[in-house]
């Protein structure tokens, strides 16, 4: 037995010496595959950004194309497809009154406001499929073959094939954001807004902060939120941009946001916050400010009081009235240049 083990050892050693280069290459390939597998399993694919979805999800993108909700004489005309660069033809893919656009794989998902349905269709608009009924007009998000959506104020999830419908919470959730393997959400409790988190099954609930704002977003390892206070002396609301760690620690004010902020329009990128607020003569304007609280910049004035701000790459899409006084989607660079109607 001992001699057999010695012979086996010698055989392995001799094979390694004779094929050292091949063995090292094979080990390197295996190592790369293992690393790729680990990284790949940790990457989440989102159908749209959280900031866009909390602004009606008017625009979603895939590759060099955008899909957006179009208006005709102030009424929703359907969902259209166009090139990001603004060149080439514009194609109508659906006449549906749909919002909260998500794109995952070769499918587009949205909420039909007329029928309160969650719809899935191919990117060319064909083969519509109803995934869920009694869906609220509120943000949906498609993440890794799951769709998160509201029925009333209750949060649910369902597979993209329409199976495994699961209720995640019975709380009256105001806002939610799926981040990796967790869901961050806000709800009202005793007149104050709580920010909490749970896992993707609705379990392991943890309160993060019990006096934060309704409007929040997770960016990197921080939670940003708007602290809204009523000034009794001046009879007006005051707004603060605040931040804290994802565990609720190190809460601090970043800056004041002056003026009548429309908190429902808040959108964000990795380094900036976007929002609409009142300016003089009862008009509104869309602004940006860096997440460190510096360089507030007015991007564009708008005629509509209620707005929705969507961002794709370096472009911002928003609602405004055209010369006839009808609501329409406009596109402008985030630096305020190249403003035009879609």
Task: Locate each region found by the language model.
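Sequence signature of WD/YWTD-type beta-propeller architectures
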Residues: 31-34, 38-342
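N-terminal Sec-pathway targeting helices
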Residues: 9-30
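N-terminal intrinsically disordered, acidic low-complexity segments at the extreme N-terminus
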Residues: 1-6
């Amino acid at each position: 037995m001992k001699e057999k083990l010695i012979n086996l050892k010698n055989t392995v050693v001799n094979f390694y010496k004779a094929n050292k280069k091949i063995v090292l290459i094979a080990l390197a390939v295996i190592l790369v595959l293992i690393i790729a597998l680990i990284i790949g399993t940790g990457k989440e694919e989102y159908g749209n950004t959280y900031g866009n979805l909390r602004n009606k999800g008017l625009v979603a993108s895939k590759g060099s194309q955008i899909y957006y909700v179009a208006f005709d004489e102030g009424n929703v005309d359907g969902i259209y497809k166009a090139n990001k660069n603004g060149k080439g033809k514009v194609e109508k893919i659906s006449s549906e009154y749909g919002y909260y656009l998500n794109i995952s794989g070769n499918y587009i998902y949205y909420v039909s406001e007329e029928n309160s349905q969650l719809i899935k269709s191919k990117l060319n608009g064909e083969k519509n499929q109803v995934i869920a009924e009694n869906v609220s007009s509120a943000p949906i998000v498609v993440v890794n073959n799951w769709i998160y959506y509201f029925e009333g104020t209750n949060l649910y999830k369902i597979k993209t094939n329409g199976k495994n419908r699961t209720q995640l919470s019975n709380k009256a959730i105001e806002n939610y954001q799926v981040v990796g393997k967790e869901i961050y959400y806000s709800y009202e409790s005793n007149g104050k807004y709580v920010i909490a988190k749970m896992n993707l099954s609705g379990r392991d609930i943890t309160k993060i902060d019990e006096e934060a704002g309704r409007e929040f977003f997770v960016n990197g390892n921080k939670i940003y939120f708007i602290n809204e206070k009523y000034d009794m002396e001046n009879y007006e609301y005051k707004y603060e941009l605040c931040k804290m760690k994802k565990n609720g620690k190190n809460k601090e004010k970043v800056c004041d946001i002056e003026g009548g902020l429309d908190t429902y329009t808040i959108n964000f990128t990795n380094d900036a916050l976007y929002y609409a607020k009142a300016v003089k003569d009862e008009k509104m304007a869309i602004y940006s400010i860096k997440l460190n609280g510096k360089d507030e910049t007015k991007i564009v004035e708008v005629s509509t009081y209620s707005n929705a701000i969507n961002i794709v790459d370096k472009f911002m899409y928003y609602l405004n009235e055209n010369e006839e006084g009808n609501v329409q989607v406009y596109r402008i660079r985030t630096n305020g240049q190249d403003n035009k109607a879609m």
